[in-house]
């Protein structure tokens, strides 16, 4: 396969990879999602990641139907990569893509859930040992020896189940013996150009020292000529002899070896000195290569039967690093395995992975699901089943956009074979996820670009999930309601699923039978005058923005008399009694204003 056949690789990139890696090695790096190899070859890490995502998951990338969906996808992988135990594991996590292969999704879920449970089973000391082992592995550059030592450390911790079962088949004694031999090489003994480390063989060390000395002299041949040239030298033969003696003394090489490297037909003294040094460098380079090959062969013989264990350790440690990294991520966020279904999206007590502060979990669903009948789910938290579309309404700062983002995150995580942030979830298979955040701009260009981004994916063949936020933000309210009605009807007609956020529920025409309206309600103010919201949507009910709570807070916090008077005027407009009820502990009268001013 040609390098330019891969997405994102043009002539210049192909030329770079060919020069640095060779075509065969470059193709291998792309097919194995080896970000490190591409970065070492000169590609920016972000670009290498994008190339590998397309190369290894082209079909799945089509699930990311909008820029906002792609942003959530990127944020999820960045979040997960933050728990990676090695740099290579982080790279492999970053190139995960949604999959349309149900068996592949189930297989990865099995591995990650097993890794999550394995990580949870470790005490703090064992976790520190695991992290320390992988840190040492990374610092050593992921060598074969580092992999062997990491495998031994993981076996001592006692990781079992799933991917870790491969560790149980390794021979500790054989690995320890192999580790000693592997300590004498840089890289892998399986490489054709293996480099034997200094200290592994005395003869090889001596040859390398002599080669280094000869190369240094060759770089300063003119200085050598000036050193050996002496007024007492009577002829050219004397200069040749002086050159051989000087080079032999400076390099530690036998004079006969230096003489053998000297030319027989030098044109002059300068030519003789430079040619002698070049020839000696060539001779010593060949000697170093021969000796290094001999030592490497001896080291391979020392490993002997343990070679298979070494190969397995290298492979297993890399896989375990990825699985356990994802397991750490799943454990940290208390992620659970979703049930994969054909159609529908339902979550019980779901949480946004992007919100740091503890928040109220919510239950929600569109499509057909079975969570409504589960034990432990209250009626208020039992989403109706069978509706194709929900229109979500309610309070400002009520978490509507966060709910859309959470549903998007749950669906994307499940599509990548990763557990999700909920107590329970059922996730269908979607060919496209259309997540569209609210945009503040109000002009025809934004409306047109928005419609271009959400309508084409909706009318394509296959299953589509629509998660669209506040259409009224991009056009006048009356027309926005008409557009939203059209989108809801189109979603139902196309057999898609959708959640649409709006403040225009009362302006909508009657919805299709398989669409419903849900609402989020503000319930008052806290003692600190913060808005108190019940983030759990109430199904089949239009939510309330309750502006009196916002006005109440503004009245209570106003310190300027005239500004406060303005807010009081608004309070009368929205209902003074309602505002006063929310400020039962506040007495906002002109006398209070004068006291505050004093």
Identify the function of each model-found stretch.
Residues 346-598:
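ATPase nucleotide-binding head domains, primarily ABC-like/P-loop NTPase cores
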Residues 205-219, 282, 286, 311, ...:
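Generic structural signal for well-ordered, non-transmembrane alpha-helical segments
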Residues 1-227:
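Conserved amphipathic alpha-helical "coupling/scaffold" segments
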Residues 308-359:
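Charged, amphipathic alpha-helical linker segments immediately N-terminal to NTP-binding catalytic cores
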Residues 215, 219-236, 240, 285, ...:
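Coiled-coil heptad-register positions
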Residues 175-193, 226-282:
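Extended, EK/Q-rich alpha-helical coiled-coil segments that serve as long dimerization/scaffolding arms
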């Amino acid at each position: 396969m040609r390098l330019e056949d891969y997405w994102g690789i043009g002539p210049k990139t192909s030329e770079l990879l060919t020069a640095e890696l060779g075509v065969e090695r470059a193709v291998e790096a792309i097919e194995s999602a080896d970000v490190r190899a591409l970065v070492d070859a000169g590609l920016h890490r972000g670009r290498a990641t994008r190339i590998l995502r397309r190369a290894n998951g082209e079909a799945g990338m089509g699930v990311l139907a909008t820029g906002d969906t792609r942003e959530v996808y990127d944020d999820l992988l960045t979040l997960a990569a933050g728990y990676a135990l090695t740099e290579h594991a982080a790279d492999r996590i970053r190139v995960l893509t949604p999959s349309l292969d149900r068996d592949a999704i189930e297989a990865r879920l099995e591995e990650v859930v097993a890794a999550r449970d394995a990580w949870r089973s470790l005490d703090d000391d064992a976790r520190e040992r695991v992290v320390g082992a992988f840190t040492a592995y990374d610092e050593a550059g992921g060598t074969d020896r580092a992999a062997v030592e990491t495998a031994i450390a993981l076996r001592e911790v006692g990781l079992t189940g799933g991917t870790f079962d491969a560790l149980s088949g390794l021979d500790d004694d054989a690995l320890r013996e192999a580790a000693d031999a592997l300590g004498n090489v840089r890289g892998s003994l399986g490489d054709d150009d293996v480099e034997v480390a200094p200290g592994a063989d005395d003869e090889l060390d001596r040859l390398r020292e002599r080669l280094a000395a000869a190369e240094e002299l060759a770089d300063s041949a003119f200085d050598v000529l000036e050193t050996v040239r002496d007024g007492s030298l009577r002829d050219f033969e004397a200069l040749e002899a002086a050159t051989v003696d000087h080079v032999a003394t400076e390099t530690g090489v036998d004079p006969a070896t230096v003489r053998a490297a000297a030319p027989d037909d030098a044109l002059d003294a300068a030519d003789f000195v430079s040619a002698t040094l070049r020839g000696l460098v060539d001779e010593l380079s060949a000697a170093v290569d021969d000796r290094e090959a001999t030592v490497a062969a001896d080291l391979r013989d020392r490993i002997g039967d343990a070679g298979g264990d070494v190969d397995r350790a290298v492979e297993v440690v890399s896989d375990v690093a990825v699985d356990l990294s994802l397991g750490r991520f799943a454990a940290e966020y208390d992620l659970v395995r979703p049930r994969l279904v054909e159609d529908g999206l339902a979550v019980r007590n779901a949480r946004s992975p992007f919100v740091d502060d503890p928040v109220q979990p919510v239950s929600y669903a569109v499509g057909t699901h079975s969570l409504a009948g589960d034990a432990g789910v209250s009626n208020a938290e039992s989403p109706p089943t069978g509706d194709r579309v929900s229109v979500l309404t309610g309070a400002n700062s009520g978490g509507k956009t966060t709910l859309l983002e959470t549903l998007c995150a749950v669906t994307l995580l499940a599509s990548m074979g990763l557990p999700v942030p909920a107590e329970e979830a059922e996730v269908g298979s979607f060919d496209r996820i259309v997540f569209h955040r609210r945009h503040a701009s109000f002009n025809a260009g934004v409306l047109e670009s928005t419609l271009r981004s959400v309508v084409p994916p909706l009318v394509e063949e296959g299953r589509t999930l629509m998660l669209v936020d506040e259409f009224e933000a991009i056009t006048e309210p009356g027309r926005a309601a008409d557009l939203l009605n059209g989108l809801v009807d189109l979603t139902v007609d196309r057999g898609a699923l959708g959640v649409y956020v709006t403040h225009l529920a009362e302006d909508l025409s009657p919805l299709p039978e398989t669409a419903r309206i849900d609402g989020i309600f503000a319930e008052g103010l806290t003692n600190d005058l913060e808005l108190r919201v019940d983030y759990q949507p109430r199904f089949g009910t239009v939510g309330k923005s309750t502006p009196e709570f916002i006005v109440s807070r503004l009245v209570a916090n106003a310190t300027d008399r005239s500004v406060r008077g303005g807010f009081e005027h608004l309070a009368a407009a929205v209902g003074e009694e309602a505002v006063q009820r929310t400020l039962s502990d506040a007495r906002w009268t002109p006398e209070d204003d004068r006291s505050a001013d004093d």
